[in-house]
Amino acid sequence: MSNLLFSHSYYYRLDPKQWKNKTPFPPLGTLYAASLLRENGFDVSLFDTNLLDSPKSIEPVLKTQQPTYLVVYDDGFNYLTKMCLTIMREACFEMIQLGKNYNCTVIVCSSDATDHYEDYIKMGADYILQGEGEITLLELVKTLDNKNPIENIKGIVFRKDKAIQVNPKREVLQDLD
């Protein structure tokens, strides 16, 4: 099975308000998604950016691990203070480019990418997961690994030929157990 490098694009040092508060939060959404893929047999690594200075810090990990997929999976938790900052979008764009430089398939899941998927696709992301992404991510990676068509996967945005394809959204999970 493929190997996945999970990360997120939140750098506390780039957010002066949160850096001043000195109350970092673990990237729970990223951890949940990574654990689901690991439980399903995938080789999973996590690169936590919270206390790092720059998106470039992921480059040595990309170089040594050579993951098949770079998954930038941002938390929905406290997203107004975290994921909707322009500087975090720019950090994600830089991470996308770094992933592409190392031949990764880049998958992004965030509230900002859901709202501005065209920008993320234009910057090189291969797939955007819209809404709750864990189940969509699992289905997408299994489908890609098996070289099956992705056109019927709910909750993804991707480039098909030269157009951006927006698939119908996946239903919100009702059973959380």
Residue map of PLM features:
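Sequence-level motif detector for i,i+2 pairs with an aromatic at +2
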Residues: 1-2, 162
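Short glycine-rich His-centered loop
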Residues: 2-23
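Short glycine-enriched, charge-decorated loop/helix-capping segments at active-site entrances
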Residues: 19-24, 83-87
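Radical SAM [4Fe-4S] cluster-binding motif and immediate context
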Residues: 25, 176-177
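Glycine-rich beta-alpha loop elements in corrinoid/cobalamin-binding modules
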Residues: 29, 36, 40, 45-175
